[in-house]
Amino acid sequence: MERTLVLIKPDGVRRNIIGEVISRIERKGLKIVAMELRTLDEETAKAHYEEHVEKPFFSSLVEFITGGPLVAMVVEGNRAIEAFRSLAGATDPVLAAPGTIRGDYGLDVQANIVHGSDSTYSAEREIKLFFPDLA
């Protein structure tokens, strides 16, 4: 079974759609094996988004992701990374298909409700960062 990290970002928590996201994950046949509501500290946020450190939007991304509580989950299932990314939709909600989480609820590329690991390597690194006991 493959595992992936899923975050319901602060915009999703603020808009009270945690249950909707979880329902979609479960209906897809994926299993939530760990879940926590937390406010991310700046150090963890910077480590999580380290691949963007040189990009002009890095500071605003860190500020956004630390700006309120989020839900962190480890999701498991057959091809979990690909399965969740198909549920999430394109990063830009304008380009995300209707019926995807971002297509239905996302506002812009930052306030796009969820994050999901994009590769096996990223999933392992991100799970270790958020849930070290599961790594």
Swiss-Prot record:
It is found in: Cytoplasm. SUPFAM superfamilies: Nucleoside diphosphate kinase, NDK (SSF54919). ATP binds at residues 9, 57, 85, 91, 102, 112. Its cofactor is Mg(2+). One of its GO terms (cellular component) is cytoplasm. Signal peptide: none annotated. One of its GO terms (molecular function) is ATP binding. Its main location: cytoplasm. One of its GO terms (biological process) is GTP biosynthetic process. It catalyses: a 2'-deoxyribonucleoside 5'-diphosphate + ATP = a 2'-deoxyribonucleoside 5'-triphosphate + ADP; a ribonucleoside 5'-diphosphate + ATP = a ribonucleoside 5'-triphosphate + ADP. The keyword Zinc-finger does not apply. The active site is at residue 115. PROSITE patterns: NDPK_LIKE (PS51374). The keyword Transmembrane does not apply. Keywords: ATP-binding, Cytoplasm, Kinase, Magnesium, Metal-binding, Nucleotide metabolism, Nucleotide-binding, Phosphoprotein, Transferase. Pfam families: NDK (PF00334). Its EC number is 2.7.4.6. NCBIfam families: PRK00668.1. Major role in the synthesis of nucleoside triphosphates other than ATP. The ATP gamma phosphate is transferred to the NDP beta phosphate via a ping-pong mechanism, using a phosphorylated active-site intermediate. Belongs to the NDK family. Homotetramer. PANTHER family: NUCLEOSIDE DIPHOSPHATE KINASE. This is Nucleoside diphosphate kinase. The gene is ndk.
